[in-house]
């Protein structure tokens, strides 16, 4: 019997071993975040500050926004047509999409075609960042004479790289002053010796004039030259290879949405604004801190979730939500090492807010200190900005620290003391809160008798000071009175002089009027005499 039991137990063990070998546990699936869209790409490679936060059911993923918000937070990678100006094209898109605000990422001349990033509504806040981004062009140079071979031309094109002096051409509506522009790279792609046409590719800084570059190439070749045609291939991060649309596409997409309510074409034409920001380093923010940032607050350490590696201080970064929405463009105040180690401090200041206010709920002012502060503001113990005033208790000023800087407390005095104390003494009485905090930590509670003695000493000292101040005040008053007397005298003298001048003028006027009247009388007498003589002659 015992042998049978042992054999059964051995067989059961073997069976369990076989089962363990046959049914293996499933491996945990690995998230492939490399395929996640836009700003969430490679999300798992970001450094983690904390994984604990409360997700709020607000906001939308950039690609899943409602169509009105999608258009409001959208950009268009437009292939600009040849004859209209950039401003005309942008105005046409504004009327087609029926939006209030549009902008573009750097003007193109009317005859130039190619990449023009059109920003819609809230995306216009990113126009400045895109105008300063690098550009790529492909242009045709026409030389004014024949040249021997293409090697010299390719050398001339290669030499025109780096920092160059450029003056805007006569056609441009810009002030014609000398500028410095850097050309990162340039190549000669083709050359047609029969027609003296060369095809060049240029990677340059924003604001470079390819027209003047073509003139310089002609000067280097010794035959002269000018630009025949130009096309922008890349503007910032957007190129003609991906997602470029024409004006007809925009018009058709809006027509489809208006008539058949089909959003798919409009979503294909318009891209989310996050597509422009993929080259920025990212900082992921907690949902509770988003609305404060939209109101202009700095990002502090408690609001930080994840951050990119190799962030340096004073570097431009993009602040994003856990859903991948862009909140703002900020300037990093910490490196990645300090973000990982610091317990408090400012992570980034805000350069440009992108997201609308109140998309996420207000989550500030909910802590215990904030509630006490609100009650004190209601009771009048703090002013409307939450800063101390006359009624603030000393416990509050001694314990509460103001992170916005030094805050001066206004102190009041009794009417008797205010008679004795001068204004500069009042100014010295207002002390910064930090200084009060330090002094209060060192001081111990003082008994009442000592307080009375101190008050009496202060009164005595104030009496001594008041006597000196009174004497100084008297001197000042006397000086003022003397000055006033002098001013009155001078004003009287001036008035006397003016009155005398007026009298003289009146006398002159009277004399002149008397003379005029005498002369009139004489002339009338002469006339009468003449008339009498003529009458006598006529009688005779």
From Swiss-Prot:
Q: Where is this region: Disordered?
A: 1-24, 414-540
Q: Does the keyword Nucleus apply?
A: yes
Q: Where in the cell is it found?
A: Nucleus, Nucleolus
GO term, biological process aspect, one: mRNA pseudouridine synthesis
State the disulfide connectivity.
Answer: none
Keyword Ribonucleoprotein annotated: yes
Question: Which Enzyme Commission number(s) are listed?
Answer: 5.4.99.-
Q: Which GO terms describe its molecular function?
A: pseudouridine synthase activity; RNA binding; telomerase activity
The Basic residues compositionally biased stretches are 473-489, 529-540
User: Residue spans with biased composition (Basic and acidic residues)?
Assistant: 490-503, 513-528
Every copy of the PUA domain together lies at 280-355
The job of this chain, per UniProt, is described as: Plays a central role in ribosomal RNA processing. Probable catalytic subunit of H/ACA small nucleolar ribonucleoprotein (H/ACA snoRNP) complex, which catalyzes pseudouridylation of rRNA. This involves the isomerization of uridine such that the ribose is subsequently attached to C5, instead of the normal N1. Pseudouridine ('psi') residues may serve to stabilize the conformation of rRNAs.
Q: Which family does the similarity line name?
A: Belongs to the pseudouridine synthase TruB family.
Q: How does it assemble?
A: Component of the small nucleolar ribonucleoprotein particles containing H/ACA-type snoRNAs (H/ACA snoRNPs).
Query: What is this protein identified as?
Result: Probable H/ACA ribonucleoprotein complex subunit 4
Say which species the protein is native to.
Answer: Dictyostelium discoideum
> Gene name on record?
nola4
């Amino acid at each position: 019997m015992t042998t049978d039991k042992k054999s059964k137990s051995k067989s059961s063990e073997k069976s369990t071993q076989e089962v363990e070998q046959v049914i293996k546990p499933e491996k945990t699936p690995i998230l492939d975040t490399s395929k996640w869209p836009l700003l969430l790409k490679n999300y798992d490679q970001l450094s983690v500050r904390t994984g604990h936060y409360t997700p709020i059911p607000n906001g939308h993923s950039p690609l899943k926004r409602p169509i009105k918000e999608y258009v409001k937070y959208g950009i268009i990678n437009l292939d600009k047509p040849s004859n209209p100006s950039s401003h005309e094209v942008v105005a046409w898109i504004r009327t087609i999409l029926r939006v209030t605000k549009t902008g573009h990422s750097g003007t193109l001349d009317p005859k130039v075609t190619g990449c023009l990033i059109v920003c819609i509504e809230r995306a216009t806040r990113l126009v400045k960042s895109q105008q300063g981004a690098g550009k790529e062009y492909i242009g045709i140079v026409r030389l004014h004479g024949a040249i021997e071979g293409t090697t010299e031309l390719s050398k001339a094109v290669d030499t025109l790289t780096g920092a160059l002096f450029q003056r805007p051409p006569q056609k441009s509506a810009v002030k014609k002053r000398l500028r410095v522009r850097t050309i990162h790279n340039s190549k000669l792609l083709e050359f047609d010796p029969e027609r003296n046409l060369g095809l060049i590719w240029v990677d340059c800084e924003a604001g470079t004039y390819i027209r003047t570059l073509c003139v310089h190439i002609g000067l280097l070749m010794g035959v002269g030259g000018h630009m025949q045609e130009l096309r922008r291939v890349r503007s910032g991060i957007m190129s003609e290879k991906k997602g470029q649309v024409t004006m007809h596409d925009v018009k058709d997409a809006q027509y489809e949405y208006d008539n058949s309510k089909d959003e798919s074409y409009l979503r294909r034409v318009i891209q989310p604004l996050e597509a422009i920001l993929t080259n920025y380093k990212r900082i992921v923010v907690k949902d509770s801190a988003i609305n404060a940032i939209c109101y202009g607050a700095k990002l502090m350490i408690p609001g930080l979730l994840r951050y990119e590696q190799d962030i340096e201080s004073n570097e431009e970064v993009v602040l994003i939500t856990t859903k991948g929405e862009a909140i703002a463009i900020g300037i990093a105040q910490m490196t990645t090492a300090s973000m990982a180690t610091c317990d408090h401090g400012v992570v980034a200041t805000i350069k440009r807010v992108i997201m609308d206010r109140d998309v996420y709920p207000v989550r500030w002012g909910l802590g215990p200190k904030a509630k006490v502060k609100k009650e004190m503001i209601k009771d009048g113990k703090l002013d409307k900005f939450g800063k101390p005033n006359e009624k603030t208790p000393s416990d509050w000023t001694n314990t509460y620290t103001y992170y916005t800087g030094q805050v001066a407390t206004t102190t009041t005095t009794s009417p008797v003391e205010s008679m004795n104390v001068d204004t500069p003494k009042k100014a010295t009485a207002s002390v910064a809160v930090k200084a009060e905090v330090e002094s209060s930590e060192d001081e111990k509670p003082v008994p009442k008798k000592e307080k009375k003695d101190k008050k009496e000493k202060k009164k005595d000292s104030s009496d001594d000071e008041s006597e000196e101040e009174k004497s100084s005040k008297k001197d000042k008053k006397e000086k003022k009175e003397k000055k006033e007397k002098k001013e009155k005298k001078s004003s009287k003298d001036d008035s006397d002089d003016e009155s005398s001048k007026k009298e003289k003028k009146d006398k002159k006027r009277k004399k002149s009027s008397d003379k005029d009247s005498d002369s009139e009388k004489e002339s009338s007498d002469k006339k009468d005499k003449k008339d009498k003589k003529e009458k006598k002659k006529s009688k005779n």
